[in-house]
Amino acid sequence: MTSLFRRSSSGSGGGGATGARGAGTGAGDGSTAPQELNNSRPARQVRRLEFNQAMDDFKTMFPNMDYDIIECVLRANSGAVDATIDQLLQMNLEAGGGSAYEDSSDSEDSIPPEILERTLEPDSSEEEPPPVYSPPAYHMHVFDRPYLMAPPTPPPRIDVPGSGQPASQRRYRNWNPPLLGSLPDDFLRILPQQMDSIQGHPGGSKPMSGEGGPPPAPGPMACDQDSRWKQYLEDERIALFLQNEEFMKELQRNRDFLLALERDRLKYESQKSKSNNAAVGNDGGFPSSVPGTSETNPTVSEDALFRDKLKHMGKSTRRKLFELARAFSEKTKMRKSKKKHLPKLQSLGAAASTANLLDDVEGHAYEEDFRGRRQEVPKVEEALREGQ
């Protein structure tokens, strides 16, 4: 209050326009006052404070005034500080509360009456109207609430679909499918033609995928495709075993396998003679060429005949061939493990050329001989100790 009255007194003594509403009319003449007022009015801005801070300041300035009255005056002036102070001063003077502020002033001089008249008089027609009040960005009643509310969430964005666009395309409009190309018609589908074959062979195995295998058969030939895959895999396994010459010699020494192979060959010849009568004459002349070849090179002819018989093996013969191949692989592994554990002297005693051709019986003989020598060594040592 002291600073407010000092500002009013300084405005009246110097003739400035920063005091109350009519402070410029006391210093100059009647012609220059409106001009000074017009020059200084645009520079004056309406001061607004935060609601709680303004209420605390006004309550400190006017302790004898009710809190609700101060709030009503502040809301009536839309938060303008200067207008609220003017009205509160006027109300305080009318209520007879001016003596409370005289004690707090720096000097005991009373307020000049002209200052009070200029401060409390209503706006004259000569002055400019006050600027248009612009409401604050925040709501005035927001400070009355005990807790501040969160700002409202914006509504979700809804894309307006086109009239002819279906719901599925509207949902996945931003999905970019990978460039895989067009899939075949029977991809992940069971055609009606395949139902009979699947029901007829419920235990059939699924075809395996391989890079070097035969081309896949069409959909209706699912069972034929399974059989072709099985045949292809069996042929590959047989070809790997038949590349080993030692395994080929073991097959030629196996009597049961040779009998089964001959039985399959005769069955194949009988089926071939029934299907094609002209092939019987050609087959009849075939054995005549065999003796000629056997005389020139009997080893090559026997190998060629044996390999030709292997082409016409039946299922039982193939099964026996796999059993022999499994036994041969196990025997080879055992033989390699024995070579690693044998002493160096015994490994040097065997010839390098016959190291891979040792039979299982010969391996047992060497092992028994080695064990016998090891058992004789402690007996000799005990005899020498007893003699000493």
UniProtKB/Swiss-Prot annotation:
Instruction: Provide ranges: composition bias, Gly residues.
Output: 11-29
The superkingdom listed in its UniProt entry is Eukaryota
Residue spans of biased composition, Polar residues class: 290-300
The residue ranges of the CUE domain are 50-93
* SMART domains named in the record: CUE
Do you know which Gene3D superfamilies this protein is assigned to?
A: DNA helicase RuvA subunit, C-terminal domain
Name the Pfam families for this protein: CUE
One GO MF term attached to the UniProt entry: ubiquitin binding
Q: Which SUPFAM superfamilies match?
A: UBA-like
Low complexity: compositionally biased ranges: 1-10
> Region entry Disordered: which residue ranges?
1-45, 152-178, 196-225, 270-302, 369-388
Record-linked PROSITE patterns: CUE
What name does UniProt use for this protein? CUE domain-containing protein 1
Originating species? Mus musculus (Mouse)
Give the gene name: Cuedc1
